[in-house]
Structure formats: C-alpha cells, structure tokens
C-alpha cells in the first residue's frame, strides 16, 4: 500500500470523519444504565462478545465482499451485500444508524475532489446500496484509493473498537488511561479476527448478539440518553 493509500485509510477511520459515529453506542448506553457494564472488566467482556459474534462474523466478511464487488464493478453483488448487512440489524435504532451513517459517508465522498467523478456515485442503483450501510462507502473508497483489503478491514476494525471505547469512557465512566488500556488489551487479537473474517464462507456469515439486540430495543424507550443507539 503506497503512502497516499495509507493516509486515505487514516481519513476513512478517523474519529473526525463527519458521519456521526460518536453519537451511537449500539446499545451500550442501556447496558451501562441497567448495570450490565459497571467497570473495565465488564466492558472488556461486552466488547469481546461483540467482536466474536458480530464484527468478526458479519461486518468484516461483508466488508470484504463489498470491496471485491467494488473492484469488479459488480453492482448486483454490491447491492446484495449492502442489503444483507442492513437486514441483519435486529432493531429499528440499529437499522437507522446503519442508514444514517451510510448516507453521511456518501455525502462526504460526493464532496471529495476525485471521488466526485466516480461513476458509482452518479448511478442511482449504486447510490441506493451506498445509503444502506457505511460499509458500502468504506469498501468503495478503499477499492478506489488502492487500499489493500486486509488493511481496510484492519482499519475498520480499529475504528469500531476505538469508537466503542470512547463511548464507554463517557458512559461508565472510565478514565482516559483506562480506555487506552482497553484498546491495548485487544490490540494483539485484532489481526486474528481479520484473518478469520477473510476465511469465512458466504453461508457462515451472520450475527448472534442477543444482548446487544435486547439493549438496543430497550434503549429506544430509555428515558434519559446521550446516544442515538
């Protein structure tokens, strides 16, 4: 991966990317409110469960397939996997989050000098798929900018984990150093998670995160909340 591709990846995974990632907790806010997550050890268990049962088995393998579809200009496959990812979101909040982030990333790409000329952004069928999930725009941009697939997956994985830790620092609350320790604890596992995701067959893709689904459902009616999911 050349220097330009490396820095474009940093832009895609930056917390400053204006897609509203910081406004979503994916059910963690309710999990903290009800006492499921009270400290750093509870947080570690929560994140480890999501990594093993959702991110590794759904988001990352779908991202890989969206990347390949982008490289081969396969609109049918691109649309299929974008809709598949959205269909796996169990609650209204999680589906809204997926679509809102997908729409926001598409708007960002529309305003970038080279991306504005990509044919995919000019075609309604591609744009419909891009609006289903952030992963679609992430995959398209990664393919167009020459970011290697494994590095794209590593980058997305780190971005997801970092955002979840930032949420936990605000909610539990954890100290900033505690948050960094949590990121460090996971860092040795992330490459193996990416490798596992790359080796998955289509029929094995899916998510099984009942705790997150329950937390997300109950978050929809939580009386006082900071986050949109």
Curated annotation (Swiss-Prot):
Gene Ontology cellular-component annotations: cytoplasm
Subcellular location: Cytoplasm
Keyword terms of this UniProt record: Chaperone, Cytoplasm, Nickel insertion
Keyword check for Chaperone: yes
Transmembrane segments annotated in the record for this chain: none
GO terms assigned for molecular function: nickel cation binding
Entries under Gene3D superfamilies matching the protein: Urease accessory protein UreF (1.10.4190.10)
Keyword Cytoplasm listed: yes
A Pfam family matched in the record: UreF
Sequence similarity: Belongs to the UreF family.
Function (record text): Required for maturation of urease via the functional incorporation of the urease nickel metallocenter.
Matches recorded under PANTHER family: UREASE ACCESSORY PROTEIN F
Subunit structure: UreD, UreF and UreG form a complex that acts as a GTP-hydrolysis-dependent molecular chaperone, activating the urease apoprotein by helping to assemble the nickel containing metallocenter of UreC. The UreE protein probably delivers the nickel.
The protein's name in its UniProt record: Urease accessory protein UreF
Organism annotation: Alcanivorax borkumensis (strain ATCC 700651 / DSM 11573 / NCIMB 13689 / SK2)
Organism ancestry: Bacteria, Pseudomonadati, Pseudomonadota, Gammaproteobacteria, Oceanospirillales
Gene, per the UniProt record: ureF
């Amino acid at each position: 991966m050349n220097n330009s591709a490396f820095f474009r990846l940093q832009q895609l995974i930056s917390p400053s990317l204006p897609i509203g990632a910081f406004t979503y907790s994916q059910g963690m806010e309710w999990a903290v409110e009800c006492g499921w997550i009270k400290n750093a050890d509870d947080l570690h268990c929560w994140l480890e469960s999501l990594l093993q049962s959702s991110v590794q088995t759904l988001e990352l393998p779908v991202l890989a397939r969206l990347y390949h579809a982008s490289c081969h200009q396969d609109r049918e496959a691109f649309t299929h996997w974008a809709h598949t990812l959205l269909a796996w979101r169990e609650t209204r909040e999680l589906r809204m989050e997926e679509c809102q982030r997908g729409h926001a990333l598409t708007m960002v790409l529309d305003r970038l000098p080279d991306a504005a000329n990509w044919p995919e952004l000019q075609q309604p069928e591609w744009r419909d798929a891009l609006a289903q999930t952030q992963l679609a725009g992430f995959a398209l941009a990664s393919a167009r900018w020459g970011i290697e697939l494994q590095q794209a997956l590593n980058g997305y994985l780190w971005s997801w984990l970092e955002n979840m830790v930032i949420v936990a620092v605000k909610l539990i609350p954890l100290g900033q150093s505690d948050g960094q320790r949590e990121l460090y604890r996971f860092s040795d596992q992330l490459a193996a998670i990416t490798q596992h995701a790359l080796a998955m067959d289509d029929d094995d893709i899916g998510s099984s995160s009942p705790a997150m689904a329950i937390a997300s459902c109950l978050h929809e009616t939580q009386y006082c909340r900071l986050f949109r999911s």
